[in-house]
C-alpha cells in the first residue's frame, strides 16, 4: 500500500504557531522532506522530533521529487515542510504535489500558519474577495506583463516581496496600478 504525503504547515515567525497535529505527524512519519534542513533542524529540535530528514528545494525538486514519489509508492509516509508557512504556497512543494497526484499518491494537508492569509486578515484591506500573486517575476518584461494584468483587478491583491526589492516594487505598483490602498506586513507572528 502506498504511503501518504503530508503537507505540514510550519511557524511563520513564532514557534507557538505550530499545531499539535503537525508535531504528531512529524513524529509519526517515516521521513521529513524539508526546504532547508539547516533551518528545519531548529524546529525539529525544539519539538524533540527525531524523524529522519532529507532536503527538497527549488534546485533539486524534479530529481528529488521522483525519488520521494518512489518512496511513497513503496509505502513510506513522508511529511513535507517549508521554511515558514504552508508547503506548496509559493515554494517547490507545488511540484511534488503534482507528481504525487499523477502517481496516485494520497496527499493530505496538516494546516496551520500561512503568511498570505495572516497578512490579509491584519491588513485592513477587503477580505471577502482577493487574489494571491505570490512573488512578481524577476524578469522585467514578465513582471510588467503581470502588473498590466493586475490593472483591471478589483479584488484585494496579496503578494510577497523580498525586502531588498520592496521600494522598487512599490514604485512599480504605484506607476502601473495607480491610487490604491497598500498594506505592508512583515514579521507577522514574532511577538
Show the residue positions of the predicted features.
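Beta-strand/loop-alpha-helix module characteristic of Rossmann-like adenine-cofactor folds
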Residues: 2-3, 114-191
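Conserved helicase motor
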Residues: 54-63, 135-140
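Glycine-rich, flexible N-terminal cofactor/catalytic loop recognition
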Residues: 1-59
Amino acid at each position: 500500500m502506498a504511503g501518504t504525503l503530508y503537507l505540514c504547515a510550519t511557524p511563520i515567525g513564532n514557534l507557538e504557531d505550530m499545531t499539535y497535529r503537525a508535531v504528531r505527524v512529524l513524529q509519526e512519519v517515516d521521513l521529513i522532506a524539508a526546504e532547508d534542513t539547516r533551518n528545519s533542524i531548529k524546529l525539529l529540535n525544539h519539538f524533540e522530533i527525531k524523524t529522519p530528514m532529507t532536503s527538497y528545494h527549488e534546485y533539486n525538486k524534479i530529481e528529488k521529487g521522483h525519488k520521494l514519489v518512489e518512496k511513497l509508492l513503496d509505502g513510506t509516509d513522508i511529511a513535507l515542510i517549508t521554511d515558514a508557512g504552508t508547503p506548496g504556497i509559493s515554494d517547490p512543494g507545488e511540484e511534488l504535489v503534482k507528481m504525487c497526484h499523477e502517481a496516485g499518491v494520497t496527499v493530505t494537508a496538516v494546516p496551520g500558519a500561512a503568511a498570505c492569509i495572516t497578512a490579509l486578515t491584519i491588513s485592513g484591506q477587503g477580505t471577502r474577495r482577493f487574489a494571491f500573486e505570490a512573488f512578481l517575476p524577476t524578469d522585467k518584461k514578465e513582471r510588467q506583463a503581470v502588473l498590466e494584468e493586475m490593472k483591471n483587478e478589483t479584488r484585494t491583491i496579496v503578494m510577497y516581496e523580498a525586502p531588498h526589492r520592496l521600494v522598487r516594487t512599490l514604485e512599480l505598483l504605484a506607476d502601473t496600478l495607480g491610487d490604491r490602498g497598500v498594506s505592508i506586513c512583515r514579521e507577522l507572528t514574532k511577538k
